Amino acid sequence: MGNNSKLQNLFKHNGMTSLKSIIILMLLFLSNPMSVVCCPLSVDKTTIEIDNSNVKDLHDIINKVRSEVDDNSKVLIKFKKDRYDFYPADAQQREYYVSNHDQNQPKKVGICIEDWNNITIDGGGSDFIFHGQMLPLAIVNSSNVTLRNFSIDFENPHIAQVEIIENKGYNGMIFLVEPWVEYRINEKGYFETFEQLTMNNEQFTIDEWKYSQYTGIAFEKENRHIVYNTSDLWIDTKDVKDLGERKLYAPNWKDARLHPGTKVAMRTWNRPAPGIFLDHSNDTYINNVNVHYAEGMGLLAQRCNNIELDGFNVCLRGDDDPRYFTTQADATHFSQCKGLIRSENGLYEAMMDDAINVHGIYLKVKERIDERTLRCSYEHEQAWGFAWGDAGDSVCFVKANSMEMLEHKNVIKTICGQQTTDNGQQNSSTAGVKEFIISFEKELPEEINADVAYGIENLSWTPEVVFRNNIIRNNRARGALFSSPLRTVCEKNVFDHTSGTAILLCGDCNGWYESGAVRDLVIRKNTFINALTNMFQFTNAVISIYPEIPNIDEQTRYFHGGKHDAIVIEKNHFITFDKPLLYAKSVDGLIFRKNKVTRNNDYKPLHWNQEEILLERVKGVYK
């Protein structure tokens, strides 16, 4: 009989105390060098020590300890400082529907914490290196979880970095492929990157993934800024030729803006999984954790309550890192969360999208079933499949064409997911759901129906936000996006060459379906350095208040604001080569005061907007 069978029999004996069980458990595991070492710090606290001798058994270890401790026990999973490699073959497969990501299933999860409270994962300064396409770490349906002291990275990123060697103008481009990139010319004559992993005890290999990248971001070699006025590149590698020594000639890649020495992060728009996934969890604390690369966002949290980030970084490995990019999408993203989101002392750099985005999700009204019942749906292709609301949640309604919020508010009585299975049967499970049948406590106004496009916002799942003492630099698109009606404070941050807008307040019931009018926001004591070197969506000024409103002339109310000091922008320092500082649309209550502006000649003015402050349908402006 093996140790595991002995253990199971021992725990079947009646009358054995918890402490006695732990002592026997420790003795049995010490007799097997491949087993976890469980050290009883006290009756109610357990330490699980992980090193490279047992890391492949991590999921079994977690499950075993989870089954043997009570819900109030505090558990520490402690890694000996080292490099730990995680492979798809050893991963847990899960059907996770992740907001603002591709909904391909299943996800291959490296470290999976589900239905567990009072647990700490301490990496001890370790590197967690992932291979293939994986979701590195998931925290699901758990409370009081702490993550600290580790880094997440991938051995072979799906973004391919190259350096421009010669720009031949109309005759194409010669580029050098960086040494860590696995590449080939595929059967259609395109440059292709890939990763092969061994299968079946190394009897054969398969392509875990392969891409022919068609877009990219250009970085200056010396200072790592995104190249001025380049935005998203179009890359055509058809008929590429191998010149040897990792140099290739692409006759159809033509772009006069790319000079020799330019670093290009060649990419696709795919985003299958974030680095860290938080779902339906309460009180999550992340400290001293780095994400160096993920094929989605650095951290994605959905339907969570209270998240604290302190020293969470999406960053390069220092000034000498040969890579110029980090994550494929946002550094951090919070969808349909509540409680307090606190993000402090972070470094967010070189990602392919925003540093932080906080928002809810609009459902679209598809059918009025009766005076208290609606059929509603998720609309964006990357946001569906997960729970949207609960009985008792407060909701409001917005007319999509004008982003006019109705005075009517209601409360959910019942909400049921609706989806059709492969055999044509209706299934009310939340997983994979795109539509909901929602009944309400009060009768709905007659105007809410499918004849006019309406969205529903869940007011119960909106957070307070503190974003403080962070550095955001050298990234694509924008810096910080806030879309919550609750108190939001953005202060003492440095936005350094964010390439697009530094701060965006949006609200969109027509494209992204990201909800949240801003009612109580302070932006103060931040430094903005040379934003707007490139043009991206919604980037009308350094600070852009830009709800997506197809027909603003239909508005009778305002989307953002609602009191005289709803949005306060004060005591900031704008260091800029261009003109626009603030753009605002559909706001009631805006204060812009005591801000300092320093002009420079670092770049030529680029922006179409040459007004310092440009306002469109704004009421109650105080300077």
Predicted segment positions?
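Short linear motifs centered on Gly/Pro in flexible linkers and helix caps
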Residues: S5, N9-L10, L28, P40, ...
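N-terminal regions of proteins, emphasizing targeting and processing segments when present
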Residues: M26-L28, P40-L41, S73, Q203
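Intrinsically disordered, low-complexity regions enriched for glutamine and histidine
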Residues: K6, F11, M26, C416-G417, ...
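Intrinsic disorder
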Residues: M34-S35, C39-S42, T420-N423
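N-terminal secretory signal peptides that target proteins for export/translocation
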Residues: M1-S18
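Bacterial N-terminal signal peptides
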Residues: K20-S35
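Extracellular parallel beta-helix/beta-solenoid repeat domains
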Residues: K45-K623
